[in-house]
Amino acid sequence: MRHRHGLRKLNRTSSHRLAMLRNMTVSLLRHEAIKTTLPKAKELRRVIEPILTLGKTDSLANKRLAFNRLRDREMVVKLFAELGPRYANRNGGYLRILKMGFRAGDNAPMAFIELLDRPETTEAVEDNSGE
């Protein structure tokens, strides 16, 4: 019996799927929030949560494992310097997936996936159109 071996196929070849998930992981770590389809967001959660858990323990072995999965030196540094300490007291559940309705072109279910406890970037935008 199969019983949950592997990832969702997402209608892609194995190499395309792994490259897409790696790129989405790096994008999520860089921007801390991205918009994607709901099945991709659910699959991304299964990929990125163990990587964030690696970032909680700062060791050479964990850095090598993270680089092996991310292939982006800048994101490995951010993972261990910023994200690891941020989630030191949290045992899993580092992400939030919010449903956003459906895409206009193909009616695909869309989702907003973001890291929890991210710093607020509330910048007031001045309206100069009235002058």
UniProtKB/Swiss-Prot annotation:
InterPro entries named among the record's database cross-references: Ribosomal_bL17, Ribosomal_bL17_CS, Ribosomal_bL17_sf
Against SUPFAM superfamilies, the record matches this protein to:
Prokaryotic ribosomal protein L17 (SSF64263)
Entry keyword annotation includes Ribonucleoprotein: yes
Instruction: Note the superkingdom of the native organism.
Output: Bacteria
> Could you give a single Gene Ontology term from the biological process aspect?
translation
The UniProt subunit note reads as follows: Part of the 50S ribosomal subunit. Contacts protein L32.
Please give the name of this protein.
Large ribosomal subunit protein bL17
